[in-house]
Amino acid sequence: FICSPKFLNQDYSLKNHSGIYFAGQMTGVEGYVESAQSGIVAGMNMVRYLNKQEPVIFPQETIMGALAYYITHCDESNFQPMKANFGILPDLPVRVKKKLRKEAYEVMDQFINEL
């Protein structure tokens, strides 16, 4: 695997060569589903790059966003591949009540509509 914190942006593109994207286990995500999701995000962002659109960066509160954040922001000197897990998600400020869950769904709906 490559040292993603050193070489990749959060949209899975190379830091010094825009338009070149990486995906899968070589980026430091581990697992079939994680590799597939990184390929989907990288492919989506490559199409957006070719169409001169801004990249899609998934919110860090989602597993897709948390994995992309982890592989691009962790310590370069100790970078190790990571599977999807609750440990890479940011802490919630409070216990999630029904109203907050509703707000979370609204935020995700808004994000999806912005794609």
Segments predicted by a language model, with ranges:
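Short acidic (Asp/Glu) and glycine-rich catalytic loops that position anionic groups and cofactors
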Residues: 18-22, 47-50, 89-92
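Generic recognition of stable, solvent-exposed alpha-helical segments in well-folded globular domains
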Residues: 3, 21, 34-38, 62, ...
